[in-house]
């Protein structure tokens, strides 16, 4: 299995931002130079990037179609993108706008039956399921929903197995406790997922801070790693991560 580094840009109100643990009240802004940053990813040698519409993630209705198309045309990057995907029409529109792969988050928890149908319709290589998880006091990986204020009926393990058995290829998993914290990914979580669903291509997300974290993700047999804050704040250089 090849290993892919996904430099990431989260967009809110036209600006590149990062949220601490997904909290919209704890936002850091990095400017509105979205296309130049994407071009810099390509210039560094990246093949892919990860693009998140934070406005849509909150309110629904993907808003970055124009930006997505511009990035894809200008840079040649393959873009994995999502935020606010609520319907089949959303998926089709984002793919038509130039996405290589559409990320489906909360809907994948709320309505797995519908999303499994999309895997068959659009092709498993065109969709990534993104699951945000938090470990409870009993060590069970739960799936917080509705702005992380409630917990889904299904656990991470149950949903990962269900999707793996339904033909899913790409799973992006974020440990909420690590997101934006530069504290290192929770590699125990990813080792657990790899053992539970070895057929899935698991992407590491949340907490990456240095080359050792990239190397650890690769050594664990994960398919890729999403790099956000560490790149934006210069803790990690993309060229080095790509060469890792």
Curated annotation (Swiss-Prot):
Cellular-component GO terms for this entry: cytoplasm
EC number: 5.3.1.16
Claim: Amino-acid biosynthesis is one of the keywords in the record: yes
Domain of life: Bacteria
Principal cellular location given in the protein's record: cytoplasm
Key words, A-Z: Amino-acid biosynthesis, Cytoplasm, Histidine biosynthesis, Isomerase
Reaction catalysed by this enzyme: 1-(5-phospho-beta-D-ribosyl)-5-[(5-phospho-beta-D-ribosylamino)methylideneamino]imidazole-4-carboxamide = 5-[(5-phospho-1-deoxy-D-ribulos-1-ylimino)methylamino]-1-(5-phospho-beta-D-ribosyl)imidazole-4-carboxamide
Localization, UniProt: Cytoplasm
Gene3D superfamilies: Aldolase class I
GO molecular function list: 1-(5-phosphoribosyl)-5-[(5-phosphoribosylamino)methylideneamino]imidazole-4-carboxamide isomerase activity
GO BP field: L-histidine biosynthetic process; L-tryptophan biosynthetic process
Pathway stated in the Swiss-Prot or TrEMBL entry: Amino-acid biosynthesis; L-histidine biosynthesis; L-histidine from 5-phospho-alpha-D-ribose 1-diphosphate: step 4/9
Active-site residue numbers: 10 (proton acceptor), 132 (proton donor)
Family the entry assigns: Belongs to the HisA/HisF family.
HAMAP family: HisA
Protein name per Swiss-Prot or TrEMBL: 1-(5-phosphoribosyl)-5-[(5-phosphoribosylamino)methylideneamino] imidazole-4-carboxamide isomerase
Species annotation: Xanthomonas euvesicatoria pv. vesicatoria (strain 85-10) (Xanthomonas campestris pv. vesicatoria)
Taxonomy of the source species: Bacteria, Pseudomonadati, Pseudomonadota, Gammaproteobacteria, Lysobacterales
């Amino acid at each position: 299995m090849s290993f892919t580094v996904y430099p990431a840009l989260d967009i809110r109100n036209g600006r590149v931002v990062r949220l601490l643990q997904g909290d919209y009240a704890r936002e850091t802004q990095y400017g509105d130079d979205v296309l130049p940053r994407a071009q810099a990813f390509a210039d560094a040698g990246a093949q892919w990037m990860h693009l998140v519409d934070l406005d849509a993630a909150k309110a629904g209705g993907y808003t970055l179609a124009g930006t997505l198309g511009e990035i894809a045309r200008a840079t040649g990057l393959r873009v994995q993108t999502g935020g606010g995907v609520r319907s089949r029409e959303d998926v089709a529109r984002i793919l038509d706008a130039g996405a290589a792969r559409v990320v489906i988050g909360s809907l994948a928890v709320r309505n797995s039956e519908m999303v499994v149908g999309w895997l068959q319709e659009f092709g498993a290589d065109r969709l990534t399921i993104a699951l945000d998880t938090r470990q409870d006091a009993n060590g069970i990986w739960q799936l917080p929903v509705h702005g992380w204020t409630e917990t889904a009926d299904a656990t991470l393990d149950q949903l990962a197995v269900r999707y793996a058995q339904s033909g899913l290829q790409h799973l992006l998993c974020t440990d909420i406790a690590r997101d934006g914290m530069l504290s290192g990914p929770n590699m125990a979580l990813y080792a657990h997922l790899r053992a539970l669903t070895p057929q899935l291509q698991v992407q590491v997300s949340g907490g990456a801070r240095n080359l050792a974290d990239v190397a650890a993700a690769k050594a664990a047999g994960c398919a890729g790693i999403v790099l956000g804050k560490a790149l934006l704040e210069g803790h990690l250089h993309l060229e080095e991560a790509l060469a890792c």
